[in-house]
Amino acid sequence: MEIIIYTMKGCGHCTRIKELIHRANVPYIEKKLDIDFTREELLEMYPKANGYPVMTVDGEFIGSLVESVKYFVEKGMVSSRK
């Protein structure tokens, strides 16, 4: 499973998604806005992206923080309680 998160500096939800992935105990790749990609490149790859963070799993667009939480809970990788 390859998880990639697209983040931007100063983004609180980006910090939270990294905490979520750590709870799931899975490796991930972080790509940072204006260092690893531009907003235009992200939208070209994932037109449904509408903010940060954006998470993909094996190239499949999952979404932002809320969708990512749902993904991990549905897969049984984290519980809905901390």
Where are the language model's segments positioned?
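C-terminal alpha-helical interaction module
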Residues: 2, 43, 81-82
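Thioredoxin-like thiol-disulfide oxidoreductase module
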Residues: 32-49
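Structural micro-motif
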Residues: 46-56, 65-66
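Non-catalytic, surface beta->alpha helical segment in thiol-disulfide oxidoreductase systems
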Residues: 57-82
